[in-house]
Amino acid sequence: MAKQEYKQLPKRAEVHSATEQFKDTIKTSLGLDLFKGLGLTIKEFFSPSVTIHYPMEQLPLSPRYRAVHHLQRLLDSGSERCIGCGLCEKICTSNCIRIITHKGEDNRKKIDSYTINLGRCIYCGLCAEVCPELAIVMGNRFENASTQRSQYGSKSEFLTSEQDAKNCSHAEFLGFGAVSPNYNERMQATPLDYVQEPSKEESKEESPTSPESHKGDENV
């Protein structure tokens, strides 16, 4: 290992007399360092402010932000999207989703109760990813502080209003859990996508020779 050599800086001359102290003070006060600091201060003073007055003002959130869930309805009809498959309950790593269903007269599952314990939820978004009907999605409401547990996780709090769904007052959800508009372009190719099928000319060259050519080889 190479030996490191350290360069020693010259020691600062000691100031003894009052005249030397005065000169050192003037040099330090009127040096370039002072003007550099003043220039930076003036620049920041006239720069636009980035401070917002929360909660009256809020910064825009990403559409794929993961916060309190939303239960979606079908547009126009207003029916609930959830079919009671229970995939969100099974994949939940924090075990905070609880679904109680029963079989209706049409042999379809009917939802009796759907609760989410927001006190245990880690907002990972797995429930939104696994939902086949885009029934549960991640919203952007992060202000959910409360003094009572009973205010956490009621279905009426998550579910989109039926009137808004019938009037189509809200667009189709494009946040976390939904398919991106340009997902085909962003989809990564698999190794099998690079395998090219052989052309007709290559397949003819690789095909086995005819029986007559084998007979000719045997006679030779």
UniProtKB/Swiss-Prot annotation:
<feature type="compositionally biased region" description="Basic and acidic residues">
    <location>
        <begin position="198"/>
        <end position="220"/>
    </location>
</feature>
<dbReference type="Pfam" id="PF12838">
    <property type="entry name" value="Fer4_7"/>
</dbReference>
<keyword id="KW-0997">Cell inner membrane</keyword>
<dbReference type="InterPro" id="IPR010226">
    <property type="entry name" value="NADH_quinone_OxRdtase_chainI"/>
</dbReference>
<dbReference type="GO" id="GO:0048038">
    <property type="term" value="F:quinone binding"/>
</dbReference>
<keyword id="KW-0520">NAD</keyword>
<keyword id="KW-0830">Ubiquinone</keyword>
<feature type="binding site">
    <location>
        <position position="124"/>
    </location>
    <ligand>
        <name>[4Fe-4S] cluster 2</name>
    </ligand>
</feature>
<feature type="binding site">
    <location>
        <position position="82"/>
    </location>
    <ligand>
        <name>[4Fe-4S] cluster 1</name>
    </ligand>
</feature>
<feature type="binding site">
    <location>
        <position position="92"/>
    </location>
    <ligand>
        <name>[4Fe-4S] cluster 2</name>
    </ligand>
</feature>
<feature type="binding site">
    <location>
        <position position="131"/>
    </location>
    <ligand>
        <name>[4Fe-4S] cluster 1</name>
    </ligand>
</feature>
<dbReference type="GO" id="GO:0005506">
    <property type="term" value="F:iron ion binding"/>
</dbReference>
<feature type="binding site">
    <location>
        <position position="121"/>
    </location>
    <ligand>
        <name>[4Fe-4S] cluster 2</name>
    </ligand>
</feature>
<keyword id="KW-0004">4Fe-4S</keyword>
<keyword id="KW-0411">Iron-sulfur</keyword>
<feature type="domain" description="4Fe-4S ferredoxin-type 1">
    <location>
        <begin position="71"/>
        <end position="102"/>
    </location>
</feature>
<comment type="function">
    <text>NDH-1 shuttles electrons from NADH, via FMN and iron-sulfur (Fe-S) centers, to quinones in the respiratory chain. The immediate electron acceptor for the enzyme in this species is believed to be ubiquinone. Couples the redox reaction to proton translocation (for every two electrons transferred, four hydrogen ions are translocated across the cytoplasmic membrane), and thus conserves the redox energy in a proton gradient.</text>
</comment>
<keyword id="KW-1278">Translocase</keyword>
<feature type="binding site">
    <location>
        <position position="85"/>
    </location>
    <ligand>
        <name>[4Fe-4S] cluster 1</name>
    </ligand>
</feature>
<feature type="region of interest" description="Disordered">
    <location>
        <begin position="187"/>
        <end position="220"/>
    </location>
</feature>
<comment type="similarity">
    <text>Belongs to the complex I 23 kDa subunit family.</text>
</comment>
<dbReference type="GO" id="GO:0009060">
    <property type="term" value="P:aerobic respiration"/>
</dbReference>
<dbReference type="GO" id="GO:0005886">
    <property type="term" value="C:plasma membrane"/>
</dbReference>
<feature type="binding site">
    <location>
        <position position="127"/>
    </location>
    <ligand>
        <name>[4Fe-4S] cluster 2</name>
    </ligand>
</feature>
<keyword id="KW-0677">Repeat</keyword>
<feature type="domain" description="4Fe-4S ferredoxin-type 2">
    <location>
        <begin position="112"/>
        <end position="141"/>
    </location>
</feature>
<keyword id="KW-0874">Quinone</keyword>
<comment type="subunit">
    <text>NDH-1 is composed of 14 different subunits. Subunits NuoA, H, J, K, L, M, N constitute the membrane sector of the complex.</text>
</comment>
<keyword id="KW-0472">Membrane</keyword>
<dbReference type="GO" id="GO:0050136">
    <property type="term" value="F:NADH:ubiquinone reductase (non-electrogenic) activity"/>
</dbReference>
<keyword id="KW-1003">Cell membrane</keyword>
<keyword id="KW-0408">Iron</keyword>
<dbReference type="InterPro" id="IPR017900">
    <property type="entry name" value="4Fe4S_Fe_S_CS"/>
</dbReference>
<dbReference type="InterPro" id="IPR017896">
    <property type="entry name" value="4Fe4S_Fe-S-bd"/>
</dbReference>
<feature type="binding site">
    <location>
        <position position="88"/>
    </location>
    <ligand>
        <name>[4Fe-4S] cluster 1</name>
    </ligand>
</feature>
<dbReference type="GO" id="GO:0051539">
    <property type="term" value="F:4 iron, 4 sulfur cluster binding"/>
</dbReference>
<keyword id="KW-0479">Metal-binding</keyword>
<protein>
    <recommendedName>
        <fullName>NADH-quinone oxidoreductase subunit I</fullName>
        <ecNumber>7.1.1.-</ecNumber>
    </recommendedName>
</protein>
